[in-house]
Structures are given as C-alpha cells and as structure tokens.
Curated annotation (Swiss-Prot):
InterPro entries assigned to the protein according to its UniProt record, in alphabetical order: Flag_Lring (IPR000527)
Region named Disordered: 87-111
Gene it is expressed from: flgH
Signal peptide (residue range): 1-21
Subunit structure: The basal body constitutes a major portion of the flagellar organelle and consists of four rings (L,P,S, and M) mounted on a central rod.
Protein name: Flagellar L-ring protein
Length: 237
C-alpha cells in the first residue's frame, strides 16, 4: 500500500513538473550590454544662492523629466498583436502492377534438351501480381488571434548608461475581488523620447519586456488543467 502511494506521488510530481515546464515566462534581468556598459558619472552641482535655476529638491524652473537613477517615469503601454494563419495538406498515393517472366522454348531436334527446356519453362511459368495500395491524407488548420493591452504604470530608472540611455523597470500589482493582476515592464529608452509630462510610449522601449498576468479562481477556470495538458503533451497520437 505504501509503495503504491509512493509511486502515485512520484507520478503526480512528474506530471506536475512537465506541466509547469510548459508555462511561458519572461526573464526580466537586464540585457548583457546593459550590464557591460559603464554607468554615466554624475558630478554633483552646488546650489547657487539667489538663483531661480538651482538644483535643489524643488527648483522653481527645472525640467520635470526623469534624469537620474531612481527617478520615476510613467510608461503608457499600448500594445496590439494580431495573427492570422492557416494551412492545409492533401496527400494521395497509389501503387499496383504485375510481372510476367520470359518463356523458355527449345527449337532444336534433340529430344533430351527439348524436355529439359520444357521442364525449366514449367518451373518458370508464373505471374507476380502486386497488391493495389491507395493512401489518402487530408488535414488543415487555421488560427486567428487579436490582443490589445492598454495600461499605464510608473517605472524606475535602474541604470543610466554611458551614452545617456536609461534602463528602466516597473512593476504593478492590483488585487480586486480575489483576482490579482500583475504587470511588469522593462527596457531601454532614450531621454529624447520622454515627453514633457514625464511619460513615454511603450513603442519607444528597446529590448522591451512586457508581462501581464492574472491570478485567481476566475483566471484558473480559463486555463487547461495541468494533468490534461501533460497527458496531451506526452500522447504519441
């Protein structure tokens, strides 16, 4: 009994691990070139007393756009994806036929050789008929998909690269009625693409990684159960 329970637990673990391995995910670690590129050095500036353009916490006249590590920037995510794909295959093959060997005839006067020829001809007198074979295969499939993602979140400048570009990362979690929504965004942006109100469109993100996930009972009901998914994945037919 214990052995059966143990084997059942092992089988359950294997099925669960196979199903988990098929779940897509995104690695939000910075690209290699971001790690390899030196950070831009910032030289602190001393405040000038009596100046309207000081570098204090809240200067009277200053650019409100993010410029340094840990500054915040608002990302307007507007992504649309659509795909339309179809395929068809029609395969037919047929085979069949017969084979007749040559006949042996002796035209001489020697009776012994004549009988030998008749004997050999009788042994060789056959027809080979190949059975007919017909194969038909027809298959096809189509897929049409359209997705729109419109959302706004704030991100933080993680690193200012030596050329002045920013590597940013943002994370947003919302919990409503037991349904948790998680949005993660990372990428490299140019300061010139930041608008005056300190916002940037997601289309300007290089090496962009955008992940939108729903967690909860409602989301689970729209997903295939892991046991069924694992069995279909391993099914050879």
């Amino acid at each position: 009994m214990k052995k059966a329970l143990y084997l059942g637990a092992v089988a359950f673990g294997v099925v669960f691990s196979m199903a988990s391995a098929n779940e897509p995910n995104i690695d939000f670690n910075p690209p290699n070139y971001v790690e390899e590129t030196p950070s831009k050095e910032f030289i602190p500036e001393l405040n000038k007393l009596g100046s309207l353009f000081g570098q204090g916490e809240r200067p009277l006249f200053a650019d409100r756009r993010a410029m340094k590590p840990n500054d915040l920037i608002t990302i307007v995510v507007s992504e649309k994806a659509s795909a339309n794909y179809s395929s068809s295959k029609d395969y037919k093959s047929a085979s069949g036929g017969n084979s007749t060997p040559p006949r042996l005839t002796y035209n001489g006067l020697d009776e012994r050789k004549k009988k030998e020829a008749e004997y050999l001809d009788d042994k060789n007198n056959y027809n080979f008929t190949k059975s007919s074979n017909n194969t038909n295969f027809k298959g096809g499939g189509s897929q049409k998909k359209s997705e729109d993602l419109e959302i706004v979140l704030s991100a933080r400048i993680i690193k200012v690269l030596e050329n002045g570009n920013y590597f940013i990362y943002g994370n947003k979690e919302v919990l409503v009625d037991g349904e948790k929504q998680i949005l993660k965004v990372s990428g490299v942006i140019r300061p010139y693409d930041i608008e005056r109100n300190n916002t940037i469109q997601s289309k300007f993100l290089a090496d962009a990684k955008i992940e939108y996930t729903n967690l909860g009972h409602l989301s689970d009901s729209n997903k295939k159960k892991f046991a069924a998914d694992a069995m279909e994945t391993q099914m050879p037919y």
